[in-house]
């Protein structure tokens, strides 16, 4: 007997589809980026993660490359801004190892939680078991399709109305990246 992935669409606003795998609480984002002024495949490097941090300073306190293993493998430390302090939610951080794989007309970034050797404030709480896969396929030089599948375990018992918070915050961050790239001029 095969098990089927059960997904629920959470939000389709701004031409970004956010859905949730209800069996394992993982999220999936799908969207296109198009800009006739920019050769988009040239932008799809590890630098995209730094751009994510620069455009989302209200969500992310910092994104730091803590170690570079090669041109295709790095460790990243995300420190999130605190939200929900009045609900007893502590400030979070996440440390991941990211690997990039380039193929014909496609690049894939995979990440998973990794041990952090950097000094971390004891008040911060680790987001555990973080995993993601981002696949960027280009239709042509000026249009790419992005698929981002991610999951992370947060220790807090969030109220039911906040169960999709991680997905919605991630969508907001990628919306800003999409908008920034689509509005770039040479």
Range-by-range predicted roles:
Residues 1-77, 87:
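Hydrophobic ligand-binding cavity/cleft-lining segments
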Residues 22-24, 33, 61-121:
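Glycine-rich portal/gate segments that line the openings of hydrophobic small-molecule binding cavities
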Residues 35, 83-86, 152-158:
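A generic structural motif
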Residues 39-45, 98, 148, 177:
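Hydrophobic pocket/interface hotspot
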Residues 41-42, 163, 167, 171:
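Generic detection of long, well-ordered alpha-helical segments
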Residues 94-98, 110-167:
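Beta-strand/loop substructures that line and gate deep hydrophobic ligand-binding cavities in soluble
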Residues 169-179:
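C-terminal functional regions of eukaryotic proteins
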Residues 180-186:
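Short, highly charged C-terminal tails/helix-capping segments
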């Amino acid at each position: 007997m095969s098990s089927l992935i059960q997904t629920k669409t959470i939000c389709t606003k701004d031409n970004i589809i956010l859905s949730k795998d209800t069996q394992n609480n993982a999220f999936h984002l799908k969207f296109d980026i198009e800009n006739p002024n920019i050769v988009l495949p040239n932008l799809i490097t590890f630098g995209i993660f730094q751009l994510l941090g620069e455009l989302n300073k209200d969500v992310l306190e910092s994104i730091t490359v803590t170690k570079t293993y090669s041109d295709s493998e790095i460790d990243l430390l995300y420190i999130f801004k605190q939200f929900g302090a009045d609900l007893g939610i502590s400030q979070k951080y996440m440390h991941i190892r990211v690997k990039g794989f380039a193929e014909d007309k496609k690049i894939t970034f995979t990440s998973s939680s990794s041990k952090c050797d950097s000094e971390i404030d004891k008040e911060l709480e680790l987001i555990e078991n973080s995993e993601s896969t981002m696949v960027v396929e280009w239709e042509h030089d000026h249009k790419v399709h992005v698929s981002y599948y991610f999951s992370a375990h947060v220790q807090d018992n969030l109220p039911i109305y906040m169960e999709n918070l991680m997905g919605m915050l991630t969508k907001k961050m990628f919306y800003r990246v999409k908008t920034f790239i689509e509005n770039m001029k040479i």
